Swiss-Prot record:
Binds 1 Ca(2+) ion. GO terms for cellular component: extracellular region. Keywords: Calcium, Disulfide bond, Hydrolase, Lipid degradation, Lipid metabolism, Metal-binding, Myotoxin, Secreted, Toxin. It comes from Acanthophis sp. (strain Seram). Snake venom phospholipase A2 (PLA2) that has myotoxic activity but no significant neurotoxicity. PLA2 catalyzes the calcium-dependent hydrolysis of the 2-acyl groups in 3-sn-phosphoglycerides. Its EC number is 3.1.1.4. It is found in: Secreted. Expressed by the venom gland. InterPro entries: PLipase_A2, PLipase_A2_dom_sf. One of its GO terms (biological process) is lipid catabolic process. This is Phospholipase A2 acanmyotoxin-2. Belongs to the phospholipase A2 family. Group I subfamily. Contains seven disulfide bonds. It catalyses: a 1,2-diacyl-sn-glycero-3-phosphocholine + H2O = a 1-acyl-sn-glycero-3-phosphocholine + a fatty acid + H(+).
Length: 30
């Protein structure tokens, strides 16, 4: 669900130019 990713981009937005990039990878938090 893209809506669920909306809450995950908080950590993904730390080092990425676009949250769409993490939609493909799966939010690499760490």
């Amino acid at each position: 669900n893209l809506y669920q990713f909306g809450g995950m981009i908080g950590c993904a937005n730390k080092g990425t130019r676009s949250w769409l990039s993490y939609v493909n990878y799966g939010c690499y938090c760490g």
